[in-house]
A protein has these predicted regions:
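Mid-to-C-terminal alpha-helical segments outside catalytic/metal-binding sites
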Residues: 26-27, 31-50, 56-103
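Aromatic-lined glycan-binding groove of carbohydrate-active enzymes
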Residues: 1-22
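Generic detection of intrinsically disordered/low-complexity segments and helix-coil linkers/edges
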Residues: 15, 20-21, 38, 49-51
Length: 103
């Protein structure tokens, strides 16, 4: 953001500070370290993080769901968003819990 504010040439192609565009990005949980996942949640919000598996490649986490469940400092709401709530919202589908509650 500093260069954008300080240099006119940095503003030639983008009208807003670079950090404002980060709000449009989504991140996945393939960070391999619970501290990094907690940082993503703190920096960008749990509503911008999706469960990642790295499938079909072999470099993913052995159990991506447990990784999210065991990451310290995440609320149950955070976990719910990351483990499917965000994907459901982005895809325009009802999360499984909402569908089951209607039965």
């Amino acid at each position: 953001d500093h260069a954008h504010a300080a240099r006119p040439d940095a503003r030639a192609k983008i009208t807003k500070a670079p950090s404002s565009y980060l709000k449009k990005l989504y991140f996945d949980t393939i960070v391999f370290n619970d501290h990094q996942l907690a940082y993503l949640v703190k920096q960008y919000g749990a509503d911008h993080i999706l469960l990642g598996t790295d499938y079909p490649y072999d470099m993913g986490l052995p159990d991506a769901v447990q990784f999210v469940r065991k990451t310290p400092g995440l609320s149950e709401r955070d976990r719910g968003l990351i483990l499917g709530g965000n994907a459901a919202r982005l895809l325009g589908i009802k999360p499984p819990a909402a569908r089951l509650a209607r039965r």
